[in-house]
Curated annotation (Swiss-Prot):
Record text on subunit structure and interactions: Part of the 50S ribosomal subunit. Forms a cluster with proteins L14 and L19.
Function per UniProt: One of the primary rRNA binding proteins, it binds directly near the 3'-end of the 23S rRNA, where it nucleates assembly of the 50S subunit.
Keywords assigned: Methylation, Ribonucleoprotein, Ribosomal protein, RNA-binding, rRNA-binding
Domain of life where this protein originates: Bacteria
Gene source species: Colwellia psychrerythraea (strain 34H / ATCC BAA-681)
Chain positions with N5-methylglutamine modification: 153
SUPFAM superfamilies the UniProt entry points to: Translation proteins (SSF50447)
Name the UniProt record assigns to this protein: Large ribosomal subunit protein uL3
PTM description: Methylated by PrmB.
Gene that this polypeptide is encoded by: rplC
One GO-annotated biological process of the protein: translation
Record has Transferase as a keyword: no
Amino acid sequence: MTIGLVGRKVGMTRVFTEDGVSTPVTVIEVEANRVAQVKTVDNDGYSALQVTTGKRKASRVTKPAAGHFAKAGIEAGRGLWEFRLNENEGSDIEAGSEITVEVFNDTKLVDVTGTSKGKGFQGGIKRWNFTMQHATHGVSLSHRSNGSLGQCQTPGRVFKGKKMSGHMGAVRCTTQNLELVRVDAERNLLLIKGAVPGAINGNVIIKPAVKA
């Protein structure tokens, strides 16, 4: 199954097993994902589900987007996401239908995608885990500097991709093979063991693990 869900990161807590073992979990609220469009190979060149979730003020919805949602007969959401489908998937799903957390009832491991927390401009030690130079013994100005940037006259430049200071975080990333501890269909919650990318209230995409 490649169909996933779009949710909102609520925060972290812990749950206890029957043996009294504490398990840290991330709580993800998954409102019903409304299907805005079903893409097919004949019409679009590939198979996919386009979904939305949440709400958005009518004044914040562009006219083309409003028409797109109205065509599917659904309420405008806070964004649009796509899930690619295999050949034998999605045949029973139509535009305007809803997908809930119950699709994960038989799933044990998931992959979670989100936007990592932005850290701003950071040096090499924090950004790339470089080792600090000595605090003394001849080091006076470069305790936290990156060190050498490369060779001298040959090649006479800094190679592309060199790990240096710069903007850290605020990038799309995925954490794989996280254990799905609990599916709460009544409250539309997923409890996932451990941490997931992103800040509280950030959008996250939950899919069945590809390496399970």
